[in-house]
Amino acid sequence: VGCAGEIKSVTPAMLSRLPCLSCSPQSCILFESRVLEVRDGTHVSIQRIKGTQDILPEASRAWQELESVMHRLTGEYGFQEIRTPVFEATALFVRGVGETSDIVEKEMYTFEDEGKRSLTLRPEGTASVCRAYVENKLYGLPQPQKLYYIGPMFRSENPQAGRFRQFHQLGVEVLGVDNPLVDAEVIQLAVQIFHALNIKGMELQINSVGCPVCRADHREVLLAFLERKRQGLCGLCQGRLERNPMRVLDCKNARCQELTEGAPTTFTSLCPECRDHFDRVQALLQTADVAYTLNPRLVRGLDYYRKTAFEIVVAEAAGTQNALCGGGRYDALVEEVGGPPTPGMGFALGMERLLKVLSDQKIELGEGRVPPLAALAALGQSAQRSAFRILSQLRRKGVPVTMDVMGRSLKSQLRTANRDGVRYTVIIGEDEMERGVAVVRHMLEGEQWEVGLEECVEWLERKYR
């Protein structure tokens, strides 16, 4: 085992046995990938890492359409795009997201660089935006700062349908204003994205998780309730009892959910300020005709939330609910990462999970790929140069055209043009070069005629406009 000539594939379990003494340096496989297939004794096929994906051209068009909707709606609400690094100091997420969160405890991709600094691939976007807000002194600009981002995140969790270890989120953050109007506007934007995509079966769920003052009171009564159920709780929830008992209410384990039925809710412990804030948020949502459901078990998985918390869930065929979007208020996070006391409110939306729902509901985004106006079919080197000149001039004018670069026969080029859905094929061969013309064929009607080479650009531009 260990010699490429003796095995067909290598799995992580086998890596510890490599290399063997009989291997030659050329045939020994020393690469930690999901599966490495050995071909003809020397060539190794390296596959993508488990939990990642290749977004191929056919699929990427749906991504572009989805991103276009998000850019448009966030712009209409007055948000500006921010782009932060994909890796940050580990301390940012430990302090910002919270030591007791699942993300920090078991899901982060953390490593040391050459300077022995602990770095982490970002598992979420809010902490990075708050760090950028502080570092770049955005608190000195007119408030609120309304920011949004679209980009990849990384978590080491079990991959499943619509869930990946590298995944993409749209996130919006409003920093600098503690006003229920902000909560209502952010929630309204999240709901409008779902409406713009025509997603069916969605439900907005809201809750108030209180502030540190009223959460201390709630913790006492909740802990007393949960201690009586301790032995029946899963191991993870037993650990949560000591660190953050509210997270027990968020457990997806069926037995834990059954045991926590009837647990004291945050509603019973809210201080007057938090209760007034939540009442005003609800009143504003009602004013805007945004339907919602109160969910007292909704606590979110991140430790930084205060007051308002919400999720948007979509009903699935099996009768379960899939949370596609979640967020809330985080009035202490900017201060946690070194800034001045600054209120904040935002949400994040999982793009892979949203695209899966769109696919499941057979919702198509946009009109798909727009084919080029024309294909240039050139036969021979001099014809290729002439065609390339025409191609370049048309592209500078914004006219979408394509050209064969494989040197294929005219028949093959016409077949490709027909497959690509172009309207015209411009044929230039040696005979056409001598006469100073090009043959233009209408691919749908089958008609063709001659156009002077010098007039080709102007003729096609008129057809495009």
Regions found by a protein language model. Give the residues of each.
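Residue-identity detector for glycine
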Residues: 2-5, 41
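Cysteine-centered motifs
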Residues: 3, 20-23, 28
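Positively charged N-terminal leader segments that act as targeting/secretion signals
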Residues: 5-8, 12
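Cationic, low-complexity basic patches in intrinsically disordered or flexible, solvent-exposed regions
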Residues: 9, 27, 33
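TRNA-recognition modules of translation machinery and tRNA-sensing kinases, especially anticodon-binding
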Residues: 40-416, 420-465
